[in-house]
Amino acid sequence: LSDAPLDEATAKYWKAMTSGGSTGRPKLIVSKDPATVEPLGEKLGLVPEQVALMPGPLYHNGPFSMGMIALQYGYHLVITSRFDASETLALIEQHGVQLIYMVPTMMQRMWRLPSSERDAYDISSLRLAWHMAAPCPAWLKEAFIEWFGGDVLMELYGGTEAQGFTTISGTEWLAHRGSVGKIVEGYSLKIVDSEGRPVPRGEVGEVYLLPDEGQGVSYFYIGAEATADVGGWESLGDMGYVDDDGYLYLTDRRSDMI
């Protein structure tokens, strides 16, 4: 056998998640990025070689993607077989967790614990607590900003297809209550009316996203056909508006409107 080093071997696609969207037939959403260090990690504030906790199921895009990006950054990854509010806090203390992924349902269950139980755990190691995947009630957001800290609690809005993302910190949210953040560098966002025309700031329309490199650079479907507007813009089906500072606010789902 040769002593020569092996050629580098990298998977062509780093993930293929299943999804049916809100009402559609199941399909595979295949990421076009190779299985290398994900550049989104830097935009999410990840720092190499820390500890991450993913209490959500890895067959969901959020915890899978956040967990795999953390592994690529050299994190020690802590996972659970099911979510338990008390166990989550205990694991943060036990492992000195610096990064955690949550959805609002998890946050509500954690907040429903008696205050004496919540306060019994040391969660001071947390640097980033990302929540996403569903709207977060304002009262719950406020409670977690006070509990975790405004620069620790973070929110992300986007889809599995990765056409674009917005992010917002708790501190920013207090100044822009109800917002899901500003568009991340490398992507563009626009709000259009029912005729596809851009609307003025502050006016509600359908939210469209586009990578700066163009439509279709981030994913392809197996079992479905991608649809895009003129110029490659794509919508996740959400309605919303952008304020004068560039912050996005979601107001409804297009499919829920009469």
Question: Across the structure, where does each feature detected by a protein language model lie?
Answer:
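Conserved AMP-binding A3 loop
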Residues: 6-7, 11-36
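Adenylate-forming
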Residues: 26-31, 37-43, 52, 89-91, ...
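Conserved ATP-binding/catalytic segment of the ANL
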Residues: 200-202, 208-258
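Short beta-strand->loop structural element characteristic of the AMP-binding/adenylate-forming
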Residues: 1, 27-30, 76-82, 154
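Adenylate-forming AMP-binding core of the ANL superfamily, especially NRPS adenylation
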Residues: 135, 175-223
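Gly/Ser/Thr-rich phosphate-binding loop
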Residues: 17, 72, 98-101, 115-176, ...
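Conserved AMP-binding/adenylation subdomain of ANL enzymes
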Residues: 34-51, 59-99, 113
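Residues that mark the start of a beta-strand
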Residues: 12, 50-51, 127-128, 206
